[in-house]
Amino acid sequence: MIRAVIFDMDGTLIDTEKYYRIFWPKALEAYGYTMTDEQALTMRSLGRPFAPRQLKDWYGEEFDYYAVRKKRKELMEEALDRDGIKCKPGAVELLEDLKKRHITTAVATATDLERTEKYLTLTGIRPYFEKLISATMVAEGKPSPDIYLYACGQLGLAPEECMAVEDSPNGVLSAYRAGCKVVMVPDQTQPDGELKKCLYACVPTLAEISHLI
């Protein structure tokens, strides 16, 4: 029986994942590096220590991950301030349905807690969530299972009692490794054959999830 639904945030609840795809390459360009679109997609929801390691593998040990990440955050914040932040289709309807059914909801995101609070508040959906879990709270980010195991612990539930909703491969792997029932709502890319083995379901929008619970 599913007693809670744990959501990824960027690209799942709110339409922000595309900005990571745009602004990782732009931040790298500012420091004299080139990042392909395929590499940018690899970075989605990739937490520490994996993100710094991946970039150093590509660009060398001297690569200043924290400086480039700071630049990416600045560029992304400028774009979000300019364009605004929107919920993904079906988000509010799903959250309202889960609330009526007394199913607990939480967020497990690679984004830091301050920006998580900001984005969810700006989109008007912050009140729906009992817990907000940031990757900064655990030793290893996605695709390690730490963040989902921690989220389940904070909710007082076993992983098998929790459904995880994710849009990216790294997020799916994190939730699957934790033992959650994983539903993917693809944002930037579709799941390949190997990733599909980790999924309970793959649906086009959040609106399709209610009937799975």
Predicted regions and their residues:
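Bulky hydrophobic/aromatic packing residues
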Residues: 17, 104-105, 192, 210
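Conserved G/P- and acidic residue-centered "switch" motifs that form tight phosphate/ATP-binding loops
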Residues: 8, 12, 109, 167
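Structural motif
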Residues: 43, 108-110, 165
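N-terminal helical cap/lid subdomain that shapes the substrate entry/recognition surface
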Residues: 2-101, 114, 126
